[in-house]
Amino acid sequence: MEWRIKEAYVKYHKSKMLINIKNNNLHLMGYSEPVNKVLDFKKLKTKLHTLPDQPNAIPYRTSYYKRDWGFCLTHNQLNKIDKKKKFHVLINSKFFKGYLNYGEIFLKGRSKKEILFSTNICHPSLANNEISGPVLAMKIAKYLKIKNRN
């Protein structure tokens, strides 16, 4: 199933915005199901994810295999929330039959053996593998293509 998100936020009920994916798309747990409700902090807290050991970092969370929803925020943000207030939670998302985009290249070599390089671009805002992996794979392919000509 493909997942698409249009809008997602947590704000004080009829008041100040607290968490918004317009500020950082890591704020929403990947594959969150649609939600539009008002909650107290006790119920909301079960859906908030932080990294207490890294209080300024927003964690990356996803729920591919279980329908759920949640928000990710810095631990410092969590500590600043007024826990006595009510919260409006909105996740405007949808699931649908999608398609798989991919790229491939096959380079013949001297041997009949095959070597497969695989990479992905499925995690948002994570440059450590989401852009570095495809870039490195392209560089290796270019190098092997040039080397094979000589």
Regions found by a protein language model. Give the residues of each.
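N-terminal hydrophobic/helix-forming segments and targeting peptides
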Residues: 1-150
